[in-house]
Amino acid sequence: MAVELGLGVFSGEWHPGTGLDHSETLRESIAQVVHAERAGLHSVWVSEHHFHPANFVGSVAPYAAAMVQATERIVVGLGLALAPLHDPIRMAEDAAFLDVLSGGRFQLGLGIGYRDVEYEGFGGTRKQRVRRTVELIEICRQAWGEGTVEYDGRIYQRHGIDVTPKPVQPGGPPIMMGGHHPDAIDRCARLGDRFCMDAGTDSESYEGGDGRNRGLLERVESAVRIYREALARHGRDTGAPHFSLNVGGFLHPDGRDAAWAALAEAYMMTRRVYGDWYGLAPEEYADWYPDRMTPEQIEQRKGELLLGTPDDLFPVLSQVRDLVGENLVIMFRSKYPLVDDALTRQSIDLLGELRTRLRA
């Protein structure tokens, strides 16, 4: 597989400032997925979150099914579903159904999550999140194979269950696992098919660092090295690791400043949401609004994103391609609430041009 460029993440969130109701917003997002397919993008990705005033859609399987039904070629993936919140048999059935409906175009991305309110809302706790994820994957693998599920875990016990229909893809849809800690990378090397790195998260910046992300290329190189080492420990192929990079940004024909102008309000709203989720005190993100930020603060925020034209973005993404190799999927987050539909579609078209250049 050559390097690929996909579009993410679709969370289905709704904001009244758009002038649309939530139904119209969801239909608009499905139309953008169709537009992404026409632009030649490889994939679209749906993420899962619950219980927040930003109106995130937690029902990721139906959302993905709507995208599958509206398209013919593009890969539709969960990037990422929160594994500890799901019953493993239900997840196995939903993933198999999506794979059958799509004709084998579905990929299952899984994360362990980090928000206590989400675990508690589904009757779980943070301390069980890793074990629940491991057992869910093991049960799904059994369920997608021949015969019945026979599983005795610390959390789940399932016996005599024959999940049907079986997936189209032999062995089931590929499982992508996210995270940024070496333990998460090792877990993916042992259980998954592809590792997903979030370009917006740098574990070293929180562990004795200064709170700022290291350079993107440095972090990609480090993650690929750690992933290869983990694959080797588990006796798996290390030659061309299956690696995804989730990176935020926006494209505009007039360059970086125009891209930021289109995205600034929406991006800073997203940063405030994540500031809350990461446990910051409200006063710490009270001034995270473009009109309250200094020029220096704005430049710092721009540096968290890939902004500009295809010519602007090609150099750094081609270096990422060269670091990772041929099994790279770049999950480019260019879908944000509050951004005008026409500007989003324009960014998608430019992503299509960028994909062509990266694959040349």
Kindly give the residue locations of the regions a language model identified.
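Active-site-adjacent structural elements that line small-molecule/cofactor binding pockets in enzymes
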Residues: 1-360
